[in-house]
Amino acid sequence: MKFSLKATIAAALMTLAAASSAHALTVYSSVDEENAKKLLDAFTKATGVETQMVFLSSGPALSRIEAEKANPQADVWFGAPSENHILAKERGLTEPYASANASALSDEFKDKEGYWHAIYTNPLAVGVRTDILESRKAPVPASWEDLKNPAYKGLIQMPSPQSSGTAYAVILTLIQQRGEDAAFTYLKELNPNIQTYTQSGTAPSGALGVGETPLAIQFTPGFLKLADEGYPVKVVFPSEGVGYEVASMSILKGAKNLDDAKKLVDWMTSKDGQGALSATKTYFLPIRSDVSGGTGVPTLDQIKLVASDPKFAAENKKRLVERWAKDVLGQ
């Protein structure tokens, strides 16, 4: 009898857990796991909506969503640059929702038909270990052109466009500024100064933190975190201007928890949701002008930004990455 009672209780608990899991909002997150958890936990605390997160970088996430189109296994795609969400919209993988907060977002931070909304933005920057450059009697760079200085030979880390969307954003920035041919000429001229092309978009800031390199190129959060923690790191926004990512979210077509998916969109685009970016120390820049990113985090109007066409970015990625490998690496 005791065994039967225990078995009954165990079965009941498993049923409850399964029911709870079935009703949780399932999120495919292309935001890094640490920061995605911070934001989704804040969402749960604010709304009571439980979430289940599966981390997938942008390419695998889009492939999985497309493969599951006939039987969606997630409710929301959370993160990945907006050009990925444009592709998802074009492929019929998402559905529109006009959040009441959309009016507080500029056009670049939302789809006009409501298929995607931005979560945050991050500009590109150069992270500088001022102590190392000082010891080498090398100047602090102020521009993209400065990075070609022979004094920096073998001292710069940046991601590889073959594996990182961050590096692809660098290519797009330079194309927008200079034109395609001149952009690839610049990257070829920069190549002797590159210590290594990392696989991960955030690896350069890690190398900067441990003093492996004095110069790193990537999106700002890793640099801002190091500076906030007291490292001798300066964040430089090249004077010619920088590109930026617009990390976005979409509700997936056929979402089983549609109402809760809408709640996530509403919360993330609200003042409270945007405030969570700084409250949880993500070092991401808010997309609302009426919300501060927190101490040490710049506002968008303090940076010379270079906008790129997300549709062009989506349609030309394979070609441009292959050209980078050919022109810069000689592959």
Briefly describe each language-model feature range:
Residues T94-N101, W116-H117, E145, P214-L215, ...:
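Short beta-strand->loop
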Residues E83-L87, G209, T213-P232, K281:
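A ligand-binding cleft/hinge motif common to bilobed small-molecule-binding domains
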Residues A24-L87:
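Early extracytoplasmic/lumenal segment of secretory-pathway proteins
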Residues N122, Y186-N191, Y197-T198, E229-K253, ...:
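Periplasmic-binding protein-like
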Residues T295-Q331:
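Extracellular/periplasmic bilobal clamshell ligand-binding domains
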Residues G127-I132, L172, V246-L258, A276:
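A bilobed periplasmic-binding-protein/Venus flytrap-type ligand-binding module shared by bacterial periplasmic
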Residues V31-E34, Q73-E212:
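Extracytoplasmic ligand-binding site segments that recognize negatively charged/polar headgroups
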Residues L252-D309:
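Mature extracytoplasmic/periplasmic domains
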